[in-house]
């Protein structure tokens, strides 16, 4: 693969933007970076790079989560973490076998409905959380090892369970550090780390040092849910475009169909964002209380 200066700048800026979102939400690095990156670079090349970056980043995020929040969520995380191992093993093996275009289709098709669910503010708590965690863990391990994406399903699960903000970040960090470490080991055994991996890693890792603290600072100034909704809105647009390109190149769909699909995704995306902002403005609207005025006789 020929690595150009333009590609390095592109990956550095992409990493900065994605780590900014990750710092604010506690997840989202891969969800934002991978759909954009695989438009210009194959999964087999970029996946190992992002796995290394996320192994480092998730370690930092776990440290920032705080011991009290980690302790409060540890038992709830275990049923998800343990099944990640077989999922990662299968996914890492499939990465060497599946054609890049099919991987792109799998990434975008799996990601888009999850993004829309988050953008819609979907909530329906699961009573048997531990039992639900087992298939979720296996699915996350499979998805992450093939695509390095797992933030949306993890975030959807924990937010659906009504976790408080700090406990939510701690739970997400624990799952993500487990999957990234296990995937690193699996990739190393399969020989997926190359000289190109480490060259691109140095370019993508440095912007994270700025992006994470910046995201944490910004989210402390605005509502975390508002930040999350705008991030998901952008993500839906990117994923919709990526899926339209897969329709063109993999399924030989017409340009009219492919770009009409992208337009539909954007329309749904904007409608969900508008609904959220409208509902939020109503809740923030000051209530006028009429105070009776005593009349002089």
Regions found by a protein language model. Name each.
Residues 44-119:
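Membrane helix-loop-helix hairpins that form the core translocation module of multi-pass transporters
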Residues 90-91, 144-149, 183-186, 237-255:
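Hydrophobic alpha-helical transmembrane segments in multi-pass integral membrane proteins
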Residues 1-5, 41-45, 97-105, 196-202, ...:
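Interfacial loop-to-helix junctions that mark the boundaries of transmembrane helices
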Residues 8, 51, 108-111, 115, ...:
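Residues within membrane-spanning alpha-helices of integral membrane proteins
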Residues 7-76, 137-139, 144, 151-212, ...:
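Small-residue-rich hydrophobic segments that form or flank transmembrane alpha-helices
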Residues 58-68, 92, 106-131, 239-252, ...:
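Transmembrane helix exit motif
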Residues 205-207, 256-272:
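Small-residue-rich transmembrane alpha-helices that serve as helix-helix interface/gating elements
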Residues 65-79, 95-105, 126-129, 193-199, ...:
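Interfacial helix-loop-helix linkers and transmembrane-helix boundary segments
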């Amino acid at each position: 693969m020929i690595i150009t200066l333009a590609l390095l700048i592109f990956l550095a800026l992409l990493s900065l933007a994605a780590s900014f979102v990750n710092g604010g939400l506690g997840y989202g690095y891969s969800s934002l970076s991978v759909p954009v990156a695989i438009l210009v670079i194959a999964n087999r090349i970029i996946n190992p790079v992002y796995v290394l970056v996320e192994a480092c980043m998730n370690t930092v995020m776990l440290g920032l989560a705080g011991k009290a929040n980690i302790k409060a969520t540890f038992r709830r995380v275990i049923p998800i973490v343990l099944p990640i191992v077989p999922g990662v093993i299968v996914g890492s093996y499939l990465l060497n076998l599946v054609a890049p275009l099919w991987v792109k289709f799998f990434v975008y098709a799996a990601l888009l409905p999850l993004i829309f669910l988050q953008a819609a503010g979907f909530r329906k708590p699961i009573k048997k959380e531990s039992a639900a965690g087992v298939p979720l863990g296996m699915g996350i391990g499979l998805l992450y090892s093939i695509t390095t994406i797992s933030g949306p399903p993890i975030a959807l699960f924990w937010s659906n369970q009504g976790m408080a903000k700090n406990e939510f970040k701690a739970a997400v960090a624990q799952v993500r550090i487990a999957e990234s470490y296990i995937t690193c080991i699996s990739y190393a055994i399969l020989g997926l780390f190359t000289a190109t991996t480490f060259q691109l890693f140095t370019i993508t890792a440095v912007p994270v040092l700025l992006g994470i603290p910046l995201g944490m600072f910004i989210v402390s100034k605005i509502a975390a849910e508002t930040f999350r909704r705008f991030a998901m809105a952008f993500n839906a647009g990117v994923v919709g475009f990526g899926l339209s390109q897969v329709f063109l190149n993999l399924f030989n769909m017409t340009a009219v169909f492919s770009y009409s699909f992208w337009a539909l995704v954007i329309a749904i995306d904007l409608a969900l964002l508008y609904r959220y902002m409208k509902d939020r403005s109503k809740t923030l609207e000051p209530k006028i209380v009429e105070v009776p005025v005593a009349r002089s006789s």
